[in-house]
Structure formats: structure tokens, C-alpha cells
């Protein structure tokens, strides 16, 4: 069962990326290091609802 998720920057809170994940394989919240255009650097992005 794949669901669409939004990834938000942990430093500025801006929602920069949209992705999908398999809830059966990854039930916990996804965390990835991605580029934040507002901060102009790579920051930790966390899955939001």
C-alpha cells in the first residue's frame, strides 16, 4: 500500500518535496537529507502529514 507523503525541512519548516512510500515496509516517519532552497544548504527533511 503506497501513500503520498510530504517532506518538510526541520530547520525552516518549508515543505519542499513530495514523495511516496510503502507503509507496510516503512511504518515510521521518513527522514532524508535533502537540499532546502530557502536555506540554500542540505538539511534534514522529515515526513509530515
UniProtKB/Swiss-Prot annotation:
Database matches in Pfam families: Ribosomal_L33
Keywords: Ribonucleoprotein, Ribosomal protein
The keyword Ribonucleoprotein belongs to this UniProt entry's keyword annotation: yes
One of the protein's GO biological processes: translation
Keyword Cytoplasm assigned: no
HAMAP family (UniProt xref): Ribosomal_bL33 (MF_00294)
Assigned protein family: Belongs to the bacterial ribosomal protein bL33 family.
Cross-referenced PANTHER family: 50S RIBOSOMAL PROTEIN L33, CHLOROPLASTIC (PTHR43168), LARGE RIBOSOMAL SUBUNIT PROTEIN BL33C (PTHR43168:SF2)
Protein name (record): Large ribosomal subunit protein bL33B
Gene: rpmG2
Amino acid at each position: 500500500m503506497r501513500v503520498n507523503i510530504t517532506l518538510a525541512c526541520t530547520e525552516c519548516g518549508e515543505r519542499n518535496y513530495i514523495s511516496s512510500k510503502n507503509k507496510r515496509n516503512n511504518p515510521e516517519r521518513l527522514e532524508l537529507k535533502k537540499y532546502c532552497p530557502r536555506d540554500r544548504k542540505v538539511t534534514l527533511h522529515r515526513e509530515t502529514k
